[in-house]
Amino acid sequence: MKAIQITEFGGPEAMELVELEDPQPGPGETVVEITRSGVNFADTHATRNEYLAAQELPLIPGVEFVGRTPEGKRVAGVVPSGAYAERIAVPVAGLVPIPDGVDDDQAVALLIQGLTADAILRVSAHLAVGESVVVNAAAGGTGSLAVQIARAMGAGRVIGLASSDEKRSLVLELGADDALDSAATGLGDRVREANGGEVDVVLEMAGGDAFDELASTLAPFGRMVTFGIATRQENTVRTGSLMKHSRAIVGFWITHLLARPELVRAGLERVMGAAAAGELRTVIGGVYPLSGAAQAHQALVGRNSTGKLLLDPSS
């Protein structure tokens, strides 16, 4: 089979298209013919061995996929690695059936990103009806879904942050009340002005200056969920400031969600059901051939993409 493999850690240039032996299923496993693989920021960290979990070489990147079983069933799955390939051997118990009305592109966009968007709002932020929400990277795979889910949950004012006019127009189309330039100076002041005061919930995945600016916008009992560090700049949280302002900073790593099957099942049922009913729109930013994995990573890290990026192992 064809696969993307890295034999030494590095950036996009470390990924090579290689020919490997087909995987053989172990006890309780099946081999899935992959039709789509998702591209995530976590993959770009993994190829550099900068992710939260240490990686081992040789490595086939990729943590999510959609495909068909030998019986022809359409299924989706999340794995520690190995999805940038034509085939993968996985436990049958971990596969999720894809409902009618959801195509392969949509299904991949609803796995990591759909679960994350749903969980950071419901499980981490405990969003209540009428509360204001700020979504950073609101035109991205997770952010674009979070804007819509927040609106469906009855949020008050929803403000999306994005880096270009095109992306901000998309954020408004998805239901945000306002869309601000995430790259302009004075982000915290502009968020407070757009909301008419401090905010209740912030969803943040950039780190660095954006983290500090957005944390300063939280109202008393406001919650900021940090679910990524795209800038690779970690922040220091001052506990005295949290106490003084009655603010909460909550971390989210999907690995811990995946260890809770009941939460995964409920989350996927919600997002897949909403998509099948036409109530949740997935934004696909591009479908690359397997040989284009490096280009997909460059687009993601360079913030030159909108929505979810996918790989098509068959092309």
Spans of features found by a protein language model:
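Short SAM/SAH-binding signature in class I
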Residues: 199-203, 222
